[in-house]
């Protein structure tokens, strides 16, 4: 459990993770200390010196033991007990981070669901965020297309497609034009 706990601590010290994201990373085999990143375990090594079969069997048994679901569950529980892991905190920080990069509600919600955060926590995090999504959509459009937004339908359609891709709702996109007219 100590190896998995140290992996979890290292991962959580770099950035917040959702529970399912951390669980997935802990279940995956760790990178080799020899620098065998991305190589399959069954692939033949190009090294001229063969590794010791006793060491490789020991490493395989440790990898099986380390990816044991009970060990992972204990590590996850330990992280919750020490307040290192919190899906609500993760969702709030993720929303703030992605909104600063110019993404809208739909895109952020989709990404959070892919990371395994449940809908209730996502909704609560959006309700607690104090982000003006209409203003953000306007800032993103002005950053991409210019300070004065286009008025021709072809150019407006381009702005709309871009903002939809970024995850903004149609109402937020329409509001940037109604605000600029007034």
UniProtKB/Swiss-Prot annotation:
Record's subcellular location: Cytoplasm
Keywords: Cytoplasm
Protein's UniProt keywords contain Plastid: no
Keyword Cytoplasm among record annotations: yes
Regions of compositional bias (Basic and acidic residues) in chain numbering: 13-24
InterPro entries from the UniProt entry: RecX_HTH_2nd (IPR053924), RecX_HTH_3rd (IPR053925), Regulatory_RecX (IPR003783), WH-like_DNA-bd_sf (IPR036388)
GO CC, any one term: cytoplasm
Domain of life according to the entry: Bacteria
Pfam families attached to this UniProt entry: RecX_HTH2 (PF02631), RecX_HTH3 (PF21981)
Region (Disordered): 12-54
Biased composition, class Polar residues, residue ranges: 43-54
Family label: Belongs to the RecX family.
UniProt cross-references to HAMAP family, sorted A to Z: RecX
Function according to Swiss-Prot or TrEMBL: Modulates RecA activity.
NCBIfam families recorded: PRK00117.1-3
Protein name: Regulatory protein RecX
Organism of this sequence: Yersinia pseudotuberculosis serotype O:1b (strain IP 31758)
């Amino acid at each position: 459990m100590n190896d998995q706990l140290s992996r979890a601590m290292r991962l959580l010290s770099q950035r917040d993770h959702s529970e399912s994201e951390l669980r997935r990373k802990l279940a995956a085999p760790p990178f080799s200390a020899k620098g065998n990143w991305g190589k399959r375990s069954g692939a033949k090594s190009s090294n001229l010196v063969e590794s010791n079969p006793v060491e490789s069997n020991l490493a395989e048994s440790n990898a099986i033991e380390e990816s044991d679901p009970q060990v992972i569950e204990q590590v996850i529980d330990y992280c919750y007990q020490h307040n290192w892991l919190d899906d609500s905190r993760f969702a709030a920080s993720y929303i703030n981070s992605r909104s600063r990069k110019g993404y809208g509600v739909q895109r952020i919600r989709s990404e959070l669901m892919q990371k395994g955060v449940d809908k209730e926590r996502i909704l609560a995090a959006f309700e607690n965020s104090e982000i003006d999504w209409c203003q953000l959509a306007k800032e993103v459009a002005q950053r991409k297309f210019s300070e004065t937004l286009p008025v021709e339908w072809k150019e407006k359609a381009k702005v709309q497609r871009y903002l939809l891709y970024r995850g903004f709702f149609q109402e937020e996109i329409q509001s940037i034009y109604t605000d600029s007219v007034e």
